From Swiss-Prot:
Name this polypeptide is given: Acetyl-coenzyme A synthetase
Record's catalysed reaction(s): acetate + ATP + CoA = acetyl-CoA + AMP + diphosphate
Keyword presence, Nucleotide-binding: yes
Gene: acsA
CDD domains: ACS (cd05966)
Family: Belongs to the ATP-dependent AMP-binding enzyme family.
Required cofactor(s): Mg(2+)
Gene3D superfamilies: 3.30.300.30, N-terminal domain of ligase-like
Residues engaged in binding CoA: 191-194, 311, 335, 523, 584
Source organism per UniProt: Shewanella sp. (strain W3-18-1)
GO MF annotations, alphabetized: acetate-CoA ligase activity; AMP binding; ATP binding; metal ion binding
Native organism taxonomy: Bacteria, Pseudomonadati, Pseudomonadota, Gammaproteobacteria, Alteromonadales
EC number: 6.2.1.1
Sequence positions that bind ATP: 387-389, 411-416, 500, 515, 526
Function: Catalyzes the conversion of acetate into acetyl-CoA (AcCoA), an essential intermediate at the junction of anabolic and catabolic pathways. AcsA undergoes a two-step reaction. In the first half reaction, AcsA combines acetate with ATP to form acetyl-adenylate (AcAMP) intermediate. In the second half reaction, it can then transfer the acetyl group from AcAMP to the sulfhydryl group of CoA, forming the product AcCoA.
This protein's UniProt keywords: Acetylation, ATP-binding, Ligase, Magnesium, Metal-binding, Nucleotide-binding
Amino acid sequence: MSSQSLYKVSGNIAANALVNNEQYKTMYQESIVNPEGFWREHGKRIDWIKPYTKIKKTSFDDHNLSINWFYDGTLNASANCLDRHLAEHSDRVAIIWEGDNASEQRKITYGELHADVCKFANALRSQGVRRGDIVTIYMPMVPEAAVAMLACARIGAVHSVVFGGFSPDSIASRVIDGKSKVVITSDEGMRGGRAIPLKRNIDDALNHPDVTSVEKVIVLKRTGGKIDWVEGRDVWWHSLLETASEHCQPEEMGAEDPLFLLYTSGSTGNPKGVLHTTGGYMVYASMTHEYVFDYKAGEVYWCTADVGWITGHSYMVYGPLANGATVLIHEGVPNHPSPARLGEMIDRHKVNILYTAPTLIRALMAEGKQHFDQFDGSTLRIMGSVGEPINPEAWRWYHEVIGHEHCPIVDTWWQTETGGILITPLPGATDTKPGSATRPFFGVQPALVDNMGNILEGENEGNLVLLDSWPGQMRTVYGDHERFVLTYFKTFRGMYFTGDGARRDEDGYYWITGRVDDVINVSGHRLGTAEVESALVSHELVAEAAVVGYPHDIKGQGIYAYVTLTRGTEESEELRQELRQWVRKEIGALATPDLIQWASGLPKTRSGKIMRRFLRKIAANEVTNLGDASTLADPAVIETLIETRLNRTE
């Protein structure tokens, strides 16, 4: 194996991990050669009401698409997260909650969570919710968000969680598409010291003329802030629980019955409702959580994602709770009121496993490691990264400052559509390379293809596809199956197209290069924007960078970089030239940025993803029609970038 920046698995970790490298190779080979046998065995990791006898009926043929797993079995997702732990672990803490203000903390045992979920499930039934109904959840990061999801699953309702930062228009489009009968929200949420007007946003969304399906709005009292009230429609959460029973028999659901809808963010046009079903999803979420994070019984696990994203669904609620973990939920942001908050929470709650995003790591990097001088971190064992490719510089900082150079990092690649992690290191099995997602999880068959769909062998770069199904895969786009087929299975026949580009190195490791539309063609040569961004961020004065292509008379496309400098660094023409030479040295002359624009901030969604379509338009000087900016955390960033753009033609 190439030794360049290789972090080897320590003997101690390999000896104590669920799987070592030899076991990984054996299990992976079996999962590909004999998927029926492999998943027949591993499907037993969850509890079934009626055990399955049929494992897999799948086809990626776009004329005969079929995705079915464990399809004659029945189960209940809520029972798998709660009931099955009660006999032995009723007193184990299921959820540790810390509010935006650290003085607010709660601990909820599995027994208590079970009672809360049963009561709220009965409350939902009292408001007319029935099996198959769609319930929209628009909640802050409080335990009741998980309670609402599990209560829906308990009675066979389909939850559609909308991220608590989305605008009324975004909420309305999702409610309309799903024809939601009931909406669950809160008076307000708290984030970074500010109150977020959740109920007001719901009121505005439901005033949309095309919203006609909603009958009830259930409101949790979080802050006690002033809200408007619609008599006959609105009802308090606590009022419903006063008369609700703690006993609620879980509904028997088919493996292929829907569990939830989750609308993908950042897409143009109508929202895309990703539909996940029950059996395969629960098997895959619980299995990936256990193996990827090398989870051991009773450990404290902290996923910093919001419950409104797929990461919150799979790796804050369903996966960890199915495995009986103690889950830390944080209402605010882990760098408020100071960058020390992340370390303080790890120490305060004795966190063993941390799963967070590169955008947070880079934000902490920019503030400086002095904020972690008092950080102990001795309980931390495994660290994960999710959401986008992590640049090597941020990886190393994470490893050194947060992990104290003893915690393996699992850099995970997956999507809303995949339900769970697809490409990832395993802590006891995989030597890691900063920036690489490394190898596929069990049952996952990645491949690289050229633009004609020809499979590329060996060390190569191309479009990332998947050759066969896995249990956590989405089943359809809600209400638009043709869109599902067209988006994922028409581009490359017989394959699932991820929309991402990747390269495979000499060791067979995968490096995600970004969305295919984040590839720049400079003078006939393809350059992944992630590669140029990583080079820029490896400079000590650069906190964050985003790179896009723009029309260039000679090269076809030029390279336009937006650069945020570290705190206290002065912008100058000299530094601009230094960065151009830095990238030239790191990658080569071809990758030298043509234009570098200083950016005090980048346009991001509230989950931290950079909205590159805005950056592409600004770089191309197309600033009159930027499109919908409702999902941006701070729309004012766009105005600043437009005013300071470098590619003006007028």
